[in-house]
């Protein structure tokens, strides 16, 4: 499948992204204040470039959301919200699970799911009356790796080490491999 199959959505402007980030931060703050006893999970996708949505990206997003819901099946979920703006898909969940435990489950999910690397599974807490993300490194996890060179993703991002084209190609290959593997296992389940 071509790269265009995964990046076929509407192109957005930087101003749209900045507005979406601001709205997301306000939504996170509101949820943390509305559910002070709960833990907040905020899910977005790591999609470089001006196209953040497409049918295939939504399919991948929804697979991860379903995996999250399955991972938290034994925990009380107080609130869920799934948003599909052109600036990128968003999912919010409040659970009674302590934030540290929630983050550990999300790190495991990011690691176990081949497409988990495409997601930001942020667990947020209020700190000085502002949303603050719990870092995987604080809990003993290793920093996220770059899709392309396997170095620390934040460093590659900060240095703009890889072009949008390179990153989209790597994401397309990852998704193509995931969907083909998923289809093959579904086919063998039906024939076996």
UniProtKB/Swiss-Prot annotation:
GO MF terms held by the record: holo-citrate lyase synthase activity
Parts of the chain that traverse the membrane: none
Enzyme's top EC category: transferase
Extent of the signal sequence: none
Reactions performed catalytically: apo-[citrate lyase ACP] + 2'-(5''-triphospho-alpha-D-ribosyl)-3'-dephospho-CoA = holo-[citrate lyase ACP] + diphosphate
One Pfam family linked to the record: CitX
GO biological-process terms attached to the record: prosthetic group biosynthetic process
The enzyme's E.C. designation: 2.7.7.61
Sorted UniProt keywords: Nucleotidyltransferase, Transferase
Family that this chain belongs to: Belongs to the CitX family.
Function: Transfers 2-(5''-triphosphoribosyl)-3'-dephosphocoenzyme-A on a serine residue to the apo-acyl carrier protein (gamma chain) of the citrate lyase to yield holo-acyl carrier protein.
Protein name in the entry: Probable apo-citrate lyase phosphoribosyl-dephospho-CoA transferase
Organism: Streptococcus pyogenes serotype M5 (strain Manfredo)
Lineage per the UniProt record: Bacteria, Bacillati, Bacillota, Bacilli, Lactobacillales
Gene: citX
């Amino acid at each position: 499948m071509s790269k265009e199959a995964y990046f076929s959505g509407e192109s957005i402007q930087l101003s749209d992204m900045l507005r979406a980030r601001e709205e997301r931060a306000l939504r996170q703050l509101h949820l943390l204040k509305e559910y002070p006893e709960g833990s907040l999970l905020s899910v977005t996708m790591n999609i470089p470039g001006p196209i953040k949505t497409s049918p295939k990206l939504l399919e991948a997003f929804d697979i991860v959301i379903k995996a999250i819901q399955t991972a938290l099946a034994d925990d009380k979920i107080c609130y869920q919200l799934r948003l599909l703006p052109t600036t990128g898909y968003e999912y919010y969940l409040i659970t009674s699970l302590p934030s540290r435990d929630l983050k550990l489950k999300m790190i495991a999910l990011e690691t176990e799911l081949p497409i988990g690397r495409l997601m930001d599974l942020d667990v947020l807490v209020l700190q000085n009356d502002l949303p603050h993300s719990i870092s995987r490194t604080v809990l003993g996890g290793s920093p996220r790796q770059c899709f392309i060179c396997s170095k620390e993703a934040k460093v590659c991002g900060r240095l703009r080490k890889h072009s949008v084209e390179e990153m989209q190609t790597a994401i397309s290959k990852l998704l193509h491999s995931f969907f083909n593997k998923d289809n093959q296992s579904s086919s063998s389940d039906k024939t076996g």
